[in-house]
A protein has these predicted regions:
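Non-catalytic, mostly N-terminal accessory regions of nucleic-acid modification and defense proteins
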Residues: 1-174, 178-179, 265-273, 363-368, ...
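Conserved Class I SAM-dependent methyltransferase catalytic core
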Residues: 28, 244-249, 309-382
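Conserved nucleotide-binding/hydrolysis micro-motifs of P-loop NTPases
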Residues: 43, 190, 246-248, 273, ...
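Conserved S-adenosyl-L-methionine
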Residues: 160-287, 292-294, 303, 307-309, ...
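A generic structural signal for well-ordered coil/turn residues at beta-strand boundaries
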Residues: 281, 285, 376-377, 388-391, ...
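Flexible, solvent-exposed coil segments and beta strand-coil junctions
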Residues: 297-300, 358
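C-terminal, active-site-flanking charged/polar segments
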Residues: 357-358, 370-420
Length: 505
């Protein structure tokens, strides 16, 4: 079981996924999402009607004059009837919706219906109607969507590395997002980082009585009651993400909405292109950008100073440009950025150390992206724009709480992560001068002398313990004595074997 969900829910979701096994994973997820959203649209409409009744206000249903498009009206139709109703009536109707007050409606208006088999639709509707999938809370919806994303390996299908949830948690704890932040992921993929930031802020702003855990340790029922008059800003002007792919843009929107974020600002645009002109806008950026994507240099932003073949160099400069003064960032980069001394590698590091305060370099182990991706050496860089670097805190993660192999079996699920967070928060008050340990400080001047090398092993001091084997003459005599013992034992064994042969004769 993954994501600590109940076995009965996992079983039903697996059945749902199997129904769409002939589709590519992204298309399958979209079709499942559209069906779930159609059900939620009627539920949202019913809630608004009840609220209006209680407040003695007039209310026009979004389904007015189109009642046959309500989930409850067609969900129990026969196979032939349901496929015609959904294809020929429901989907043409939802594409005409323009009521921005309905959070599900505006993301259904561009939906396309691609289910051709009537039985697939009938069985999918039955599963979506099950009690296990209808707790009517963002916690359950979020778990459902997170499970679907993982089982369908959406990021892998789109040639992206899924950042494990516990590594996302680590990065969030290092930059501490707040409701006052403007948070961006310029390469957001499924929106995983933004969703985690949303949950973190919600938890930080929920009173203890509203922070509950189920039997698997999942936190739920977060009310965010301390947000008070900041709710509107939190929902509308806090989270921003961008994707090159239209399908991934839609997936990210659905993911965030299923987790409870009502108005995610997710756009389809290449943030390296000239069409994307934002700068100095965000107070927090958290991401895992593509390392080796090809870059269309003929359509690249004009404010870049690097000229490279690999996309990671452009993304690092982009992140710097997007941050406001005092803005923070946690970003995953390949090891080559850390130790590289070529022109572009050095230029990017000079930028992050001369015009930002590079707070930390955290070395991750090779298997961190298994089982979702390949073995790759990476680091987390944490920096703050606008202050020059005086010293950099290095940490080598030896364990992340899972076995370091392709199976990635859970040990405790955390490994060094709590220690990293604790020591990072105490780095200005504790002594980190001992470079024989797994974390230490290195001054900017020393790093500069080493051509801006940011690799952990460059500064780690390894002390080899001296082993005293004693007097060499005595050691040789011991070896001779040992060999004599072996020889004598061999002769005794030979005598015994010869004796057995004579007796048998």
């Amino acid at each position: 079981m993954i994501f600590n969900i109940k076995p009965e829910l996992e079983e039903k979701l697996d059945e749902l996924i199997e129904l769409f096994s002939t589709m590519n994973p992204t298309e399958a997820l979209e079709q499942i999402s559209f069906l779930i959203f159609l059900k939620r649209l009627e539920e949202e409409d019913n809630k608004k009607a009840n609220d209006a009744l209680l407040e003695e206000k007039d209310f026009d249903s979004i389904f007015k004059d189109n009642e046959g498009c309500q989930w409850s009206k067609w969900a129990n139709m026969s196979a032939d009837a349901i496929i015609k109703q959904v294809r020929d009536v429901v989907f043409p109707f939802i594409r005409t919706l323009h009521d921005e007050s309905f959070i599900y409606a505006k993301y259904l208006k561009n939906a396309t219906f691609n289910i051709e088999n009537p039985q697939t639709l009938v069985q999918a509707v039955k599963i979506i109607n099950l009690e296990e999938l209808n707790k009517k809370d963002s916690f359950t919806d979020g778990l459902i969507y997170k499970y679907l994303l993982s089982r369908l390996n959406i990021e892998g299908q789109n040639k992206q590395y899924k950042t494990p949830d516990h590594i996302v948690h680590l990065m969030i704890e290092l930059v501490k997002p707040t409701v006052d932040d403007s948070i961006c992921d310029p390469t957001c993929a499924t929106g995983n980082f933004l969703e985690a930031c949303y949950q973190h802020i919600l938890k930080q702003n929920s009173s203890p009585e509203f922070i509950k855990k189920d039997e698997y340790g999942n936190v739920y029922d977060l009310k965010g009651d301390k947000l008070e008059n900041k709710w509107d800003k939190f929902n509308k002007n806090t989270f921003y993400g961008f994707n090159v792919s239209q399908s991934m843009t839609r997936v990210a929107i659905m993911n965030l909405m299923m987790h409870g974020l009502q108005n995610p600002n997710i756009q389809q645009i290449d943030t390296l292109s000239r069409q994307y002109e934002e700068a100095n806008k965000y107070s927090l950026i958290i991401c895992n950008p593509p390392f080796n994507n090809k870059v269309n240099t003929s359509d690249i932003r004009t404010d870049f100073t690097v000229t490279a073949k690999k996309s990671i160099y452009y993304y690092l400069e982009l992140i710097f440009n997007l941050l406001t003064i005092g803005g923070r960032c946690a970003v995953i980069v390949p090891e080559g950025i850390a130790f590289g001394i070529k022109k572009n590698e050095k230029k990017v590091k000079e930028l992050l150390m001369n015009y930002a305060r590079l707070d930390a370099v955290i070395k991750l182990h090779l298997k961190i992206f298994q089982p979702f991706g390949k073995d790759i050496s990476t680091n987390i860089l944490v920096f703050t724009k606008g202050e020059p670097t005086e010293k950099v805190w290095f940490y080598e993660m030896e364990s992340d709480g899972y076995t370091i192999d392709k199976k990635r079996t859970k040990i405790d699920g955390w490994g060094d992560i709590p220690d990293i967070i604790e020591k990072f928060n105490k780095r200005d008050i504790e002594d980190f001068s001992d470079r024989t340990k797994k974390c230490f400080f290195v001054t900017f001047e020393e790093i500069k002398k080493e051509n801006y090398d940011l690799s952990f092993n460059k500064y780690k001091i390894i002390r080899y313990e001296e082993i005293n084997f004693g007097d060499p003459k005595e050691l040789i005599q011991k070896i001779i004595n040992f060999e004599e013992q072996i020889l004598n034992t061999s002769k005794e064994v030979e005598k015994l074997l010869n004796g057995e042969r004579e007796n048998n004769a």
